Every structure is written in structure tokens, then in C-alpha cells.
Swiss-Prot record:
Comp. bias regions, Polar residues: 73-83, 91-103
Bias (Basic and acidic residues): 51-72, 106-120
Coiled-coil portions: 177-663
Compositional bias (Basic residues): 15-41
Keyword Lyase attached: no
Keywords carried by this UniProt record: Coiled coil
Protein name in UniProt: Golgin subfamily A member 6-like protein 1
PANTHER family to which the protein is assigned, alphabetical: GOLGIN SUBFAMILY A MEMBER 6-LIKE PROTEIN 1-RELATED, TRICHOHYALIN-RELATED
Disulfide bonds: none
Organism encoding this protein: Homo sapiens (Human)
Chain segments carrying region Disordered: 1-120, 323-356, 384-466, 481-591, 603-639
Family membership: Belongs to the GOLGA6 family.
Length: 668
């Protein structure tokens, strides 16, 4: 069977190739293939360069068979020697019938055999024509399917480009999300630190509040006791004043009734009583003034402490509100991130499904192309067979015509025209030889041209194939690199997301552990506070017993203790204020960082600054008040000195009174 040279058809530039499926080197994939079912096949197809000798030999054999049909003497089995003997016999004038009769079959048998052979060939030709028509129909159907599949491939290429653009957008979005995640993580870390500092401040403030409440209760109790004492002192004072008035009345009555000596003795006694009473009154007045001053100072301190407590409570509430707002913002950001991650997962799933559909469609296209290639090969083989059968049919027709001519010539001329026929046959042989020579020359020229064309085509096709192979290799390498980069990026993103989620979980667990620790610490603090309260109640009971036993000493010691406590509290307040200042400086730094991120926090920072200025003003006021207290203490010292001077004067007056009484007694 002849094998026609199959040209290396170029592949379509827009047809996607699967990297794992083998492509056929001779597979026609150009979309503009002929699809008409009645296209005529060209009869003069180029012959293969290796089959030129066989075609020449077949032509020579056909010419010899024609000669044997006319003249049975020209048998191909005899060879060149039989032709030489024929020429000799003709020249010698021998009978031609002797040469034609020996070693040949009858013409009727040859005609029957030729008719049978022709009928068999016709049947084969009809069957082959039927198969060719079926194959042409299948070819048209496959070409239509190829056209539609290529159209679908173009659509899928457009969809793939859209998906690639979406992928790039999703990568950009993923990068933005990573940046947002990093920003959120930093914000969360800052918020956690800020929350820890605020919790520490809250704990310190709660302890201060607890201590201040305890001191307030103690001061209230002391104030109540002092008020009771003041009431008692006032009642005693009123009683003493009544006693003084009664004594004065008694003196006046005694002056009127009793004699002078008794009057002097009673006057002396009453004077002593008056002096003692006046001294007691002065001492009580001084004590009352001191107690009033102390009460006023304690009330002022109570008011200040209450104001500070209210301010601290307001600050704590504001900080808790800030923390809640930050937690709400973080939750909203986490929800947004989760939604965006869900959208990303959905998009990736859609992309995977679409890629799977693309792969399936490409595999179907490859299978269709392979089917087309196989059917085209079958069609080419059938066309080759058709060409061979057409040649055989032409030869048989020529033979039949020649047989008819020969039979007519045999009937008409038989022996007389044998010599002419032989001469004609010789002339025909010479012409055939000349024609064969011409055919040989033409075939050689055609073969040379075909060889040149085929070499050029082969070179062009080889160059095209090399370029296409290079392009395909580059495309495959590029695709594999892109896929590897995409997979690496996706893996990195997934690893980052998982790491961030693990970090978030770890942070949440740490926060929970810290909260549990805080709860435990608060419970411990509460237990300690309860113990302290119990101990304080016991101490109070003991102090009350001691106060009942030693009222005066206890009062003085309490005053000293109160003063020392006040000093300690003031020192603690100063230390706390210094701590608060340091914390405020830290808070300012944090607020400056947050101010760059959020405008709302700027407003809150301004409020905090205003509050801090108020605190500074309050601290300045406290300093001024302390200075005033020092001035008041100096005034008290001065008053005490004046009191000492007054006492000295009273003593001098008493001495003068005694001298005057002595003079009176001496005069009497």
C-alpha cells in the first residue's frame, strides 16, 4: 500500500494544550479546514520519491500486457529472446500462424476471466465509494464538532483570562488583607498592652478607693465622736456658766448679809473657783477651737478625697468605654476578615471548578482531534486505493477497446495485416520508448522539483516545529512556574492565615488565662480585705477599750496618729500622683500612636489632656492648700504663744490680786 507524505500542519496559536497529554505531530488543528462533503479529490497527487521505480516497472508491464492481448507471441514470460526469434522468422518468410497458435489460451476464456475480474473490481469500487462517502460525512461532522469545540475553547480562553484577572485581583486583595491583618494585629497588641496597663491602674485605683473608703469611714466615726464630745463640752460650758452666774448671785447676797471677814473668805474661795472655772473655760474654748479646726480640715480633706474618688471613677469609666470601643472595633475587623476569607475560599473553589471544566474540555478536544486524525488517515488510504483502482479501470477500458479493435482486425485481415500490425507494433514500441524516455525525463524533472519543494517545505516545517516546540516549552515552563508561584503564594497565604489564627487563639487563651488570674487575684484581694476588715474591727474594739481607759492620752495619741496618717496619706498620694504622671506620659505616647490611626481617639486624647490639666490644677490647688495649712499651723503656733503670754499675764494679775488682798488684810 502506498503511503502519501503527510505534511506537518501547524497547530492553531490559540488552542490550549494540556501539559500532561501527548500531542500528535501530524494532527491538523487549524480551524479553516475544508468541510464540504462533495469536494473532489485531486487525481494527480504527488508520488513518493521512493516509489518512482515501481511506477516505471508497472507502466512497462501494462504495455507488454497490451501487446500480448493483440499478439499472443509477445508473452512476457519469454523475455527478449522470443522477440528476437519473431524478427528472424518474419525476415525468413515463415508462416505466422505457427507462431500465434502455440502456448496461448482461447480468447473466450480470456474475455470471461476479464469480465469476472472487472465485476469484482466494480464491487470493490462500489464498496470503497460507499465507505468513502460515509467517511466524508463523518469527516464533515467531526470538522463541525471541531469548529464548535474550538469556538468553545475560545470562549473558555476568554473566561480563563477573566479568571486570571480575577485571580490577580484576589491576590492584590489578599495582600491588602495581609496588611490589614498585620495592622489589626499591631493594634490588638497595643490594645492588649493598653488594657493590661489600664487593668493595673484599675487595680491600684480600686485599692486606693478601698483604702480611702476605710479612711473615710474612720474619719466619719471620729467626726461623730468629736461632735459628741463637742456637745458634751458645750453642755458642760453652759452648766459652768450657770454655776458662775449662781456664784455671782451668791456673792452679791453674801455681801449684803454676811460680815466682811466672811465675805473676804468667801470672796477668796469664790475667786479661786472663778479662776479655776475661767481656766477650764479657756482650756475648753481652746480645745473646742482646735477640734473645730481639725473637723474643718478633715471635712475639707474628705471633700477633696471624695472629689478625687469621683474623678478616678469617671476616668475608670472612660477607660472602660475606650476599651469596649476598641474591643468592638477589633471584633468588627475580625468579622470583616472572616467574611473576606470566606469570599476568597468561595472564589478559589469556583476557580478550581472552572479549571477542572477547562481540563475536561481540553481532553475532549484532544480526543476529537485524535479521532479526526485517524479518520483522515483512513480517508487518505482510501483515496490512494481509489487512485489505484481508477488507474486499473482506465487500463481495463483501454484493454477492452484494444481487444475489440484486435478482434475486428483479426476477422477482416487475419493474416494479411499481421506484418503491418507487427510493424505498427514496432513503431508503437519505439514511440512508447520515446514517450517513456520523455516521461522519464519529465518525471525526473518533477521529482527534482518535488524534492526541492519538499526540502523547502521540510525546512520550513522543521523551523516552524522548532519554533512551536520552543514556544510550547516556554509556555509550559511559564505555566508550570506560574502554577508553582501560585501554589507557593497560596500555601504561604494559608500558612500566614493559619499562623495568625493560631496567634489569635493563643492570645485569646492568654487573655482568658489573664482574666482568670485577675479573677483569682480579685477573689484573693477580697478575702484579704475581709480579713483586714475583721482585723480592723478587732482593732477598733481594742481601741475603744483603750479610749475608755485612757481618754486624754488616747485623744492626744489619736491626734498624733491622725496627723501621721495624714502625712503618710499625703506622701502616698504624692507617690501615686508621680506614678499617675508616668502612666499619663505612657498613655500620651500610646495615644499619639493611636492618634495617627484613628481620628476619634484624637478627640478622646484631647479630653484626657484637658482632664490631666484639671488634675494638674487640682494638684497645684492641693499644694496651695498645703501651704495654707502650713500657714495655719504657724498661726496656731503664734496663737499658742499668745495664749502662753495671756496665761503669764493672768498669773501676774493673780499675783497682783493676791498682793492687793494681802494689803487689804493688812489694812483691816
Amino acid at each position: 500500500m502506498l503511503m502519501w507524505p503527510q505534511p506537518h500542519l501547524p497547530t492553531h496559536p490559540h488552542l490550549p494544550t494540556h501539559p500532561h497529554l501527548p500531542t500528535h505531530p501530524h494532527l491538523p488543528t487549524h480551524p479553516h479546514l475544508p468541510t464540504h462533503p462533495h469536494l473532489p479529490t485531486h487525481p494527480h497527487l504527488p508520488t513518493h520519491p521512493m516509489m518512482s521505480k515501481e511506477t516505471r516497472q508497472s507502466k512497462l508491464a501494462e504495455a507488454k500486457e497490451q501487446l500480448t492481448d493483440h499478439h499472443p507471441q509477445t508473452n512476457p514470460s519469454v523475455g527478449t529472446a522470443a522477440s528476437d526469434t519473431k524478427k528472424k522468422k518474419i525476415n525468413n518468410g515463415t508462416n505466422p500462424e505457427t507462431t500465434t497458435s502455440g502456448g496461448c489460451h482461447s480468447p473466450e476464456d480470456e474475455q470471461k476471466a476479464s469480465h469476472q475480474h472487472q465485476e469484482a473490481l466494480r464491487r470493490e469500487l462500489e464498496a470503497q465509494v460507499h465507505t468513502i462517502r460515509i467517511l466524508t460525512c463523518q469527516k464533515t461532522e467531526l470538522q463541525m464538532a471541531l469548529y464548535y469545540s474550538q469556538h468553545a475553547v475560545k470562549q473558555l480562553e476568554g473566561e480563563a483570562r477573566d479568571l486570571i484577572s480575577r485571580l490577580h485581583d484576589s491576590w492584590k486583595f489578599a495582600g491588602e488583607l495581609e496588611q490589614a491583618l498585620s495592622a489589626v494585629a499591631t493594634q490588638k497588641k497595643k490594645a492588649d498592652r493598653y488594657i493590661e496597663e489600664l487593668t493595673k491602674e484599675r487595680d491600684a485605683l480600686s485599692l486606693e478607693l478601698y483604702r480611702n473608703t476605710i479612711t473615710d469611714e474612720e474619719l466619719k466615726e471620729k467626726n461623730a465622736k468629736l461632735q459628741e464630745k463637742l456637745q458634751l463640752v458645750e453642755s458642760e460650758k453652759s452648766e459652768i456658766q450657770l454655776n458662775v452666774k449662781e456664784l455671782k448671785r451668791k456673792l452679791e447676797r453674801a455681801k449684803l448679809l454676811l460680815p466682811q471677814q466672811q465675805l473676804q473668805a468667801e470672796a477668796d474661795h469664790l475667786g479661786k473657783e472663778l479662776q479655776s472655772v475661767s481656766a477650764k473655760l479657756q482650756a475648753q474654748v481652746e480645745e473646742n477651737e482646735l477640734w473645730n479646726r481639725l473637723n474643718q480640715q478633715q471635712e475639707e480633706k474628705m471633700w477633696r478625697q471624695e472629689e478625687k474618688i469621683q474623678e478616678w471613677e469617671e476616668k475608670i469609666q472612660e477607660q472602660e468605654e475606650k476599651i469596649r470601643e476598641q474591643e468592638e472595633k477589633i471584633r468588627e475587623q475580625e468579622e470583616k476578615m472572616r467574611r473576606q476569607e470566606e469570599m476568597m475560599w468561595e472564589k478559589e473553589e469556583k476557580m478550581r471548578r472552572q479549571e477542572e471544566m477547562m481540563w475536561e474540555k481540553e481532553e475532549k478536544m484532544r480526543r476529537l482531534e485524535e479521532m479526526m486524525w485517524e479518520k483522515e488517515e483512513k480517508i487518505r488510504e482510501l483515496e490512494e486505493k481509489m487512485h489505484e483502482q481508477e488507474k486499473i479501470r482506465e487500463q481495463e477500458e483501454k484493454r477492452q477497446e484494444e481487444e475489440k479493435i484486435r478482434e475486428q482486425e483479426k476477422r477482416q485481415e487475419q493474416e494479411a495485416k499481421m506484418w503491418r500490425q507487427e510493424e505498427k507494433i514496432r513503431e508503437q514500441e519505439e514511440k512508447i520508448r520515446e514517450q517513456e524516455k520523455k516521461m522519464w525525463r519529465q518525471e525526473e524533472k518533477i521529482h527534482e522539483q518535488e524534492k526541492i519543494r519538499e526540502e523547502e517545505k521540510r525546512q520550513e516545517q522543521e523551523e516552524m516545529w522548532r519554533q512551536e516546540e520552543k514556544i510550547r516549552e516556554q509556555e509550559e515552563i511559564w505555566r508550570q512556574k506560574e502554577k508553582m508561584h501560585e501554589q507557593e503564594k497560596i500555601r504561604k497565604q494559608e500558612e500566614k492565615v493559619w499562623r495568625q489564627e493560631e496567634k489569635m487563639h493563643d492570645q485569646e487563651e492568654k487573655i482568658r488565662e489573664q482574666e482568670e488570674k485577675m479573677w483569682r487575684q480579685e477573689e484573693k484581694i477580697r478575702e484579704q480585705e475581709e480579713k483586714i476588715r475583721e482585723q480592723e474591727e478587732k482593732i477598733r474594739e481594742q481601741e475603744e477599750m483603750m479610749q475608755e481607759q485612757e481618754e486624754k492620752m488616747g485623744e492626744q495619741e489619736e491626734k498624733m496618729q491622725e496627723q501621721e496618717k495624714m502625712r503618710r496619706q499625703e506622701e502616698k498620694i504624692r507617690e501615686q500622683e508621680e506614678k499617675i504622671r508616668e502612666q499619663k506620659e505612657k498613655i500620651r505616647e500610646q495615644e499619639e500612636k493611636i492618634w495617627e490611626q484613628e481620628e476619634k481617639i484624637r478627640e478622646q486624647e484631647e479630653m484626657m489632656q484637658e482632664q490631666e490639666e484639671k488634675m494638674w490644677e487640682q494638684e497645684e490647688k492641693m499644694c496651695e492648700q498645703e501651704e495654707k495649712m502650713q500657714e495655719q499651723e504657724e498661726k496656731m503656733r503664734r496663737q499658742e504663744e499668745k495664749m502662753w503670754e495671756q496665761e503669764v499675764r493672768l498669773r501676774q494679775q493673780e499675783e497682783k490680786m493676791q498682793e492687793h488682798q494681802e494689803h487689804l488684810e493688812a489694812a483691816i
